[in-house]
């Protein structure tokens, strides 16, 4: 049986990246929450 996690930087950025977050209203909400919390890294 193969492992389920097969890392890919492109897929990672496309789903969880900054531009992906900015594309939707909820994504922008995620960023604002992370800014409010004081996260050093907002996205991957």
Curated annotation (Swiss-Prot):
GO terms for molecular function: structural constituent of ribosome. PROSITE patterns: RIBOSOMAL_L34. Pfam families: Ribosomal_L34. It comes from the Bacteria. Keywords: Ribonucleoprotein, Ribosomal protein. GO terms for cellular component: ribonucleoprotein complex; ribosome. One of its GO terms (biological process) is translation. Belongs to the bacterial ribosomal protein bL34 family. HAMAP family: Ribosomal_bL34 (MF_00391). This is Large ribosomal subunit protein bL34. It comes from Ectopseudomonas mendocina (strain ymp) (Pseudomonas mendocina).
């Amino acid at each position: 049986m193969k492992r389920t996690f097969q890392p890919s930087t492109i897929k990672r950025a496309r789903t969880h990246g900054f531009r992906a977050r900015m594309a939707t209203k909820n994504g922008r909400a995620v960023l604002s929450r992370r800014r409010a919390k004081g996260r050093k890294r907002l996205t991957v």
